[in-house]
Regions:
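Fe-S-dependent hydro-lyases/dehydratases of central metabolism
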Residues: 1-214
């Protein structure tokens, strides 16, 4: 099994992703394959990375892409169509994130999986089937750094240069940092406190007089 590097959650605006690509071939790879149901009992997501594709990896006895030493440190996942279908478990993108995946490129994605990825800072891009196949069949894909430019919607390496497709709303959220709800709330702490203090029922809670704010 590949050693997983120390987890660092993405925060704030994201404009580029640079890293090696890892290829996972197959249509309709569902969330139960990404993270089997028995791992959903966890109280947090911290250790899900080591269990990603657990059953598939066991069946392939060390030959699964997520077990190959050549894919160590990879952060851009290349998939086929309807990736992330099945149940809506948010554990699936969380497991990928904690393994080290920071972006996914594929033919298509299940809608709920796509939204769950966006919510934790994993941008998902689409490409036509032919171009995805070209990337997946490139024997040098594991040996060179690739760069995704979210603003320009491009995917570049020493071997190819493709224009990616991403929803404009998703693109804007990554570039502005609005995908990161926690950081957005923390950055606007004073505005939130002011809004709370302006609410009549919060003033009521601060007073012993029942009708003070009326």
């Amino acid at each position: 099994m590949i050693m997983i590097k120390k987890f660092e959650a993405p925060v704030g605006p994201i404009s580029t992703i640079v890293g090696k690509s890892i290829v996972l071939i197959g249509d309709d790879i569902d969330t139960d394959r990404i993270i089997p149901a028995r791992f959903l009992k966890c109280v947090n997501f911290d250790n899900l990375g080591q269990s990603v594709f657990e059953d598939d990896r066991k069946n392939l006895k060390g030959k699964h892409p997520f077990d190959l030493e050549s894919n160590t440190g990879s952060s851009i996942l290349i998939v086929n169509s309807n990736f992330g279908c099945g149940s809506s478990r948010e554990h699936a993108p969380q497991a990928l994130l904690r393994w080290g995946i920071r972006a996914i490129i594929g033919e298509s994605f299940a809608e709920i999986f796509y939204c769950n990825c966006i919510a934790i800072g994993i941008p998902c891009f689409t490409l036509p089937k032919k171009l995805v196949k070209n990337i997946q069949e490139n024997k040098n894909i594991n040996n060179s750094l690739c760069e995704i430019n979210i603003k320009e919607s491009t995917f570049k390496s020493n071997f190819f240069n493709f224009d990616l497709v991403i929803k404009i709303s998703s693109k804007n959220m990554f570039l502005s940092g609005e995908w990161d709800a926690t950081s957005t709330l923390l950055a606007n702490k004073k505005l939130i406190e002011k809004k709370i203090n302006d609410l009549p029922y919060t003033k009521f809670n601060q007073s012993n007089e029942l009708f003070e704010t009326i």
